[in-house]
């Protein structure tokens, strides 16, 4: 996917997601384990993404309920494999089991609660943990901003410490680089102010994270922080504050201090700036598509597209076993 030029500010939200979806259509559809798609919204998102050639779904959940939902809302699932599971918790466990059995390259949330799915994903026994901390990224299409914006973490890590933030940042950078958004993203580590002060611990952590990047402990991105939100995304604000930085004013990844601030930032962008947001969980054995009941059809498809492109890149980069 060709990155959006930094100088071309978009005036409508469709173009970035259109290109994202088009890029996902150009690669083979990702085998996707869809957990408990038992309502119209979640099942329609699966059907639409499959019809677009982005995913090849396996539906996991109460088969009778899934078929009744499809029939009631005139959704054609005749070509989909269905793995029966009695309820949402069993569906999550079965979905994780199918990933272990190499039946899917990504996991997708249906109509169950996020906590139910993530309990199965993060379980110490039989889950999908890796050595990397699991984190969430919103891939946001803000109409008035030139670049696609990543915001992390607004859904998984409540009060991340320095080590957790290291993984949160690395997860986001890896997604940006591997899913085709570009190379060496500009990463702004946000706080309330752009100066380091002992009275605001997040400013100290931001400075430490930047030094960790200098020492090669975080790779693949260009970090700066602490930065306040205005001087992270607005060149004039950065200039007025006298901030000289390759990141300030044109950040592509926004790293928030904690889940509360991240959630508020993402929802502010969605409701005030009319942004679309695609949610994906990283750091597990496979990418996990997390959608919300409030997501638009385009945002649901974009979530699948992001995860599909990432899964494709991982497949391409996987080491081959000599015969």
Regions found by a protein language model. Give the residues of each.
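Anion-binding alpha/beta catalytic cores of soluble intermediary-metabolism enzymes, centered on
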Residues: 1-247, 251-323
